[in-house]
């Protein structure tokens, strides 16, 4: 399973929100580039960036910061937030971003998602952010009547590369991921699902690892990495590629039970 550190950018700084509430913001670092370098140095194989300002206004805001991160690290980067038209997505991918994450546009203009998938195969991910099972849009400020599973099925048919599922009520709370919702979503679609929201411990990651065989292939971790609840190195050893439980017993005992 791929452990993906999250870097949320608001006003040029690295922050975390509580349940997606912009009024409940905690600043963790004034320089997101330094944060990206840290996670890369600690063994991250991919980074998850969100331009929170762009998610609200629907157009890029922290583009210079994102460009600086791309130049600073040599690992794949996925970026979301405010990607609602062709030129924005195309310019972002042209910078060297591996995958663009679409949110609001998946609800409002699914035909545009189809167009993106045809033009940029393998590079389009849809982020499904759910509140009580229904999809939230526009930086989580609005909630639609569309069920998360229904949207996932529709997006899978359009051939998006993966689905990122976030339970908004869990996001930033360290209360653990919504395992049942993830199980339902992963069972419904045949494309990879990436878990996000509430992950607080190695045990949470091990619970997600149990869903890997049905399609949960990654976990985005935010607040727990910043508060020290999860060590990226230990997380990779526990559930990442070449994890300890995959090592033959005769090569030594694991520190993880």
Swiss-Prot record:
Question: What catalytic activity is recorded?
Answer: 1-(5-phospho-beta-D-ribosyl)-5-[(5-phospho-beta-D-ribosylamino)methylideneamino]imidazole-4-carboxamide = 5-[(5-phospho-1-deoxy-D-ribulos-1-ylimino)methylamino]-1-(5-phospho-beta-D-ribosyl)imidazole-4-carboxamide
Q: Where in the cell is it found?
A: Cytoplasm
Q: Which cysteines are joined by disulfide bonds?
A: none
Record the organism.
Trichodesmium erythraeum (strain IMS101)
Question: Which key words tag this protein in UniProt?
Answer: Amino-acid biosynthesis, Cytoplasm, Histidine biosynthesis, Isomerase
One GO cellular component assignment for this chain's record is: cytoplasm
Q: Which NCBIfam families match?
A: 1-(5-phosphoribosyl)-5-[(5-phosphoribosylamino)methylideneamino]imidazole-4-carboxamide isomerase, PRK13585.1
Pfam families assigned to the protein according to its UniProt record, in alphabetical order = His_biosynth
Report the EC number(s), separated by commas if there are several: 5.3.1.16
Protein name listed in UniProt: 1-(5-phosphoribosyl)-5-[(5-phosphoribosylamino)methylideneamino] imidazole-4-carboxamide isomerase
Family membership: Belongs to the HisA/HisF family.
- Record gene name: hisA
